[in-house]
Amino acid sequence: MRAFILTGGLLATVTAGTGAMAATVITLDQSVNGQPGRPQVMYLDTDKLRMSSPDNDMIYRGDQSKVWIVRPQDKAYIELTPEGMAQMKAQMDQMQAQMQQRMASMPPEQRKQMEAMMAGRGMGPNAPAKPQITYTKAGEPKKVGDYSCTPFTVTMTAGPASDFCIASLSDLGLTRDDLKSFVGFGQFMSQMGGTGTQRSPMASLDFDSMKQQIGFDGFPVETAFKAPDGRHNVDTVLKSIQHEAPPAGTFDIPAGFTRQDMGAGMGGPAMGHGPRPPS
């Protein structure tokens, strides 16, 4: 399964099955490896989140402690629960331990390269459950589309750097509460810490840490993620933010879809890697 990078990638206040209330709907344009941009739409509710791309959808239900990865073309979905994720993490930890044993017999230089590659992917025995994120100002304020933002280089523990242009939440008409489900999704996925699921700084969004470093609560209007090997580059640009009711059933599995196991080979969306949070 491919990781959600989220845009990442970004992202309703609706009460399922009852009267519609205003939601936060964030629309992004994401380009992978220089290809034409594709739309990514995020719907945010207090404890619900949906990230949609042309190929896949990811639905986070904080009220149920579940994530669904939905593939409309297959009429199928994968369900992630804390119990299932703990099982997956144990399996991946075992695989990484076997990899470490094989690496022990490698020539020093080759072993060093492998260790660096795994660390860059947020994997390995020393990978932190919650990566440390550092923001370094990288230029003067500028305009990206209709938004004013300040450039920052964003680095994660033992990982590659991303280029962000960050606007203040107030300038975007957002509050921390609007992004509450986005933060909740990142915390949910942190249960897979050390397995490479949190390669995007946005997947570990911490407003307190961000404000302490850059001086304000912000959100990226432009991100650029480049993998160390140069084979995976993701550029994401914020197009619009609206407060409106999302379509009925936005946070539910479509009727008639079949549940598949994690091993069924379904790819997941990701902003920077499907739907993704900003990288």
Label each region the model flagged.
Residues 1-8:
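Bacterial N-terminal signal peptides that target proteins for export
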